[in-house]
Regions:
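N-terminal auxiliary segments of SAM/dcSAM-dependent transferases
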Residues: 4-42
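The AdoMet/dcAdoMet-binding core of the Class I SAM-like
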Residues: 35, 63-191, 195, 199-201, ...
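A short, structured beta-strand/loop element
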Residues: 39-54
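Short glycine-enriched, charge-decorated loop/helix-capping segments at active-site entrances
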Residues: 57-61
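Conserved Class I S-adenosyl-L-methionine
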Residues: 202-217
Length: 217
């Protein structure tokens, strides 16, 4: 069902006044952590994009700031008690934290290609991983291919990977979605975060329909 070498830079006093707490360039993107009032956000900055990837409300840490994140939780209407969850894309770690807090005995694997994002999530957003809430520094396609070989299945798969511009191209192909389908359990649910305003939206919708049939949009 669908529903590196790291180069860190010092933060100047001027940037501190603008609320920038951390800035570094990883192998994949430029990462900024900035704070406005009680809102702590991670931002990936590229030539064509300068949008927040993850935000945490320091006055209410368990509140999901973004509407899409709150909507993602509606996956539990279709599978109320998932035992294993796969999340592609870590950001500040708000989604794995939310599912972990809500579900007893759940095991969550979060795959993040950029080790710098993992480091920032732990240092600034206080994300913690353990045996039941793992974070794996790996390309999602490689991880899923290995999961197929090991016959690993997930009751809920969430595709939430962004590179600061849009979804990485190799995670938008029919071939990738067919691989994702193979790691879904019999009653498994797939949730994908896409932009309705993207010029690729119709292409994405057609690709998902080719693989999964009808879906909720």
């Amino acid at each position: 069902m669908l529903l590196p070498l790291l180069v860190a830079s010092m933060v100047s006093p001027a940037k501190e006044r603008l609320g920038i707490l951390h800035e570094e360039r990883s192998l994949y993107t430029r990462i900024l952590v900035h704070k406005v009032n009680d809102l702590l956000c991670m931002k990936f900055t590229l030539v064509r994009s300068d949008s927040n990837q993850s935000c945490k409300d320091l006055s209410a840490p368990k509140r999901l700031v973004f509407a899409y994140a709150r909507m993602t939780m509606s996956a539990l209407l279709f599978n109320r008690h998932p035992q294993k969850i796969l999340i592609v894309g870590l950001g500040g770690g708000t989604l794995p934290e939310a599912f972990f807090d809500l579900l007893d005995n759940v095991k969550i694997d979060t795959v993040e290609i950029d080790p710098a994002v993992i480091k920032v999530a732990k240092e600034y957003f206080l994300f913690e991983d353990d045996e039941r809430k793992r974070v794996i520094a790996q390309d999602a396609r490689v991880f899923i291919k290995r999961a197929i070989l090991q016959s690993t299945e997930y009751d809920l798969v969430i595709l939430d990977a962004f590179n600061g511009d849009y979804i990485p191209e190799h995670l938008m192909t029919k071939e990738f979605l067919l691989e994702v389908q193979k790691v879904l359990s019999r009653d498994g649910v797939l949730v994908a975060n896409t932009f309705g305003t993207s010029k690729l939206y119709d292409y994405e919708s057609n690709t998902y329909q080719d693989v999964f049939g009808s879906f909720i949009n």
